[in-house]
Regions:
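Extracytoplasmic redox metalloprotein regions
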Residues: 22-24, 28-45, 53-292
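Bacterial Sec-dependent N-terminal signal peptides
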Residues: 1-16
Length: 292
C-alpha cells in the first residue's frame, strides 16, 4: 500500500481512515487521500488538480473558453493552497486569495434574478460585466455580541463584520427579483449585499459522509432547543424541501451558501468550476448567465 498502517489510534484520524494524510508539510492540504492512492486513482486525482489549479483563458488550449462573463479565471484564486479565502478590504476578482462572492438580495433573502446567484464582475471583450467591481465598497465595522465581547474569565476579544455597498452607477443590469415566476422590479433602497466566503477544499467529503438520518436528527434537536431554522428547509420535525439529484432520488440539502445542493458529486466544485469561469463542456452547452 502507498500508505501502510502506522501506530496511531484510529480515533485520532482527523479525516477518518480513508481521508487522513500524515504529511505535515505546507502541502498537506493539497494531498490526495490515502484511500485515493490505495485505490490506484492518483492519476485521476492529478487530472482533477489540472482543472483546479490552472488559469483559464479565452483562447489558449486546453484551458480555454473563459467567459463571456465570469467570476474568477481559476479555482485557486479563491482557494489558495486549497484552503479558504482570506479577508480583504476591497473586491477585486484578480486579487489572489480573495475568496469572496457577492450575494445580492431584495432585502427579504430572495436573490435578485437579474443577476446570477454568484454575480459576475469580469468579462471578456466586447462584453461588459453586470457590476463594476472597482466601485464596490467593503467597510469592516466593529461588532459587539450578546456577551459583550468578553469570556467568562474576563478576557476580552474584538469582532468585526463587513458592510458592502454597490452604488447604483456600478451596475449595468436592472434590479429585479422573481416571485412565483413573475419578474418584479426591486427598489435600490431595498437591496442588501452580503459576502459569501469560500471554504477549504479539505474536509468537504466528511460532510458528504454524514448520514441523512443523522442530519435530520440534528435539525430536530436544534429546532427543539429553540434555534431559528429556515422554514424553507426544515419545520415541525420534517424536511420542507429536498434536493432532487441527477438520478431523481431526493436528498437533504447540505452544500453551498444557500443550501442548494446535496451531493458532493453535484455540489460545490463539481458545478462551480464551470460556473466560476463560465467554461462550457461537451455535455454542458450553456453559460452561467441570466436572461437579462
Amino acid at each position: 500500500e502507498v500508505n501502510p498502517d502506522i501506530n496511531v489510534n484510529v480515533e485520532t484520524y482527523a479525516g477518518g481512515e480513508l481521508g487522513t494524510t500524515f504529511n505535515n508539510s505546507a502541502s498537506a492540504y493539497e494531498d490526495p487521500t490515502p484511500a485515493t492512492e490505495n485505490a490506484g486513482m492518483t492519476d485521476k486525482f492529478k487530472y482533477g488538480e489540472y482543472f483546479f489549479e490552472r488559469s483559464y483563458t479565452q483562447n489558449s488550449k486546453p484551458f480555454n473558453g473563459l467567459g463571456p462573463l465570469y467570476i474568477r479565471n481559476s479555482c485557486m484564486n479563491c482557494h489558495p493552497g486549497y484552503g479558504h479565502g482570506k479577508r480583504v478590504d476591497r473586491y477585486r476578482a484578480d486579487d489572489w486569495g480573495n475568496g469572496y462572492l457577492l450575494v445580492v438580495t431584495d432585502g427579504k433573502d430572495n436573490y435578485l434574478s437579474s443577476l446570477t446567484g454568484m454575480p459576475q464582475t469580469k468579462a471578456v471583450a466586447p462584453f461588459k460585466a453586470p457590476i463594476d467591481e472597482d466601485k464596490i465598497k467593503i467597510d469592516w465595522l466593529p461588532y459587539t455580541d450578546e456577551w459583550g465581547n468578553k469570556f467568562p474569565d474576563g478576557e476580552t476579544y474584538s469582532l468585526i463584520y463587513p458592510e458592502v455597498t454597490i452604488p447604483q452607477d456600478a451596475r449595468s443590469e436592472p434590479l429585479e427579483a422573481t416571485y412565483n415566476q413573475v419578474v418584479t422590479p426591486v427598489n435600490y433602497s431595498d437591496v442588501v449585499v452580503l459576502l459569501e466566503s469560500t471554504i477549504g477544499i479539505y474536509g468537504t467529503g466528511l460532510l458528504d459522509a454524514i448520514p441523512d438520518d443523522s442530519l435530520k436528527a440534528e435539525y430536530a434537536r436544534q429546532e427543539k432547543a429553540g434555534v431559528k431554522l429556515n422554514p424553507a428547509i426544515f419545520a415541525n420535525g420534517e424536511w420542507t424541501s429536498l434536493y432532487k439529484g441527477l438520478t431523481g432520488k431526493q436528498y437533504p440539502k447540505r452544500y453551498t451558501y444557500a443550501l442548494t445542493r446535496s451531493s458532493i458529486q453535484d455540489g460545490p466544485g463539481a458545478n462551480a468550476i464551470w460556473n466560476i469561469t463560465n467554461v462550457t463542456r461537451s455535455d454542458r452547452r450553456y453559460h452561467y448567465m441570466t436572461d437579462t
